[in-house]
């Protein structure tokens, strides 16, 4: 009987751990992208995996992160109104925890370093590789 109780306790612990992990899993991803076709491509890759929000520029992204519940940001670096590096720096002033992943056509090391220095947690290069995008999001809990 004590063995059965221990198994039940272990099962309860696993259920508690599962529910705690579920709470941490990013579910809402903000895609900051000014080119509609790129947003549609990301949307099709992430379809049914995350709830998506969209901002066409960095200024709107900062406002969305400030006012809505967002778990992860995919940030284009070159956009009108406010670029991705500036938006990332602004977000970091009030939210140091949210994962921000640069998603950009700029593939040079200097661009990568600049994005990471601005506060991005990771860096993905366009054209978008669906498998790489999914693997990266999985690493951040989505």
State what each model feature region is.
Residues 1-19, 140:
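C-terminal catalytic ATP-binding subdomain
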Residues 40-44:
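Charged docking surfaces used in two-component/phosphorelay signaling
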Residues 79:
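Receiver (REC) domain active-site loop signature in two-component systems and cognate sites
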Residues 50-56, 64, 124:
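Short hydrophobic/Thr-rich beta-strand motif most characteristic of the beta2 strand and flanking loop
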Residues 68-74:
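Active-site beta3 strand of CheY-like receiver
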Residues 128-137:
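C-terminal output helix
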């Amino acid at each position: 009987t004590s063995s059965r109780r221990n198994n039940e306790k272990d099962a309860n612990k696993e259920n508690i751990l599962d529910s705690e992990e579920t709470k941490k899993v990013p579910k809402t991803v903000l895609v900051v992208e000014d080119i509609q076709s790129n947003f549609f491509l990301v949307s099709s890759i992430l379809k049914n995996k995350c709830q998506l929000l969209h901002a066409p520029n960095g200024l709107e992204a900062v406002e969305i992160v400030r006012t809505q519940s967002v778990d992860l940001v995919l940030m284009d670096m070159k956009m009108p109104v406010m670029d991705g590096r500036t938006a990332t720096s602004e977000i970091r002033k009030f939210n140091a925890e949210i994962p921000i992943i640069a998603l950009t056509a700029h593939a040079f090391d200097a661009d990568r370093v600049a994005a990471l220095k601005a506060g991005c947690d990771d860096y993905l290069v366009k054209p978008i590789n669906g498998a790489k995008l999914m693997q990266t999001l999985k690493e951040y809990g989505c």
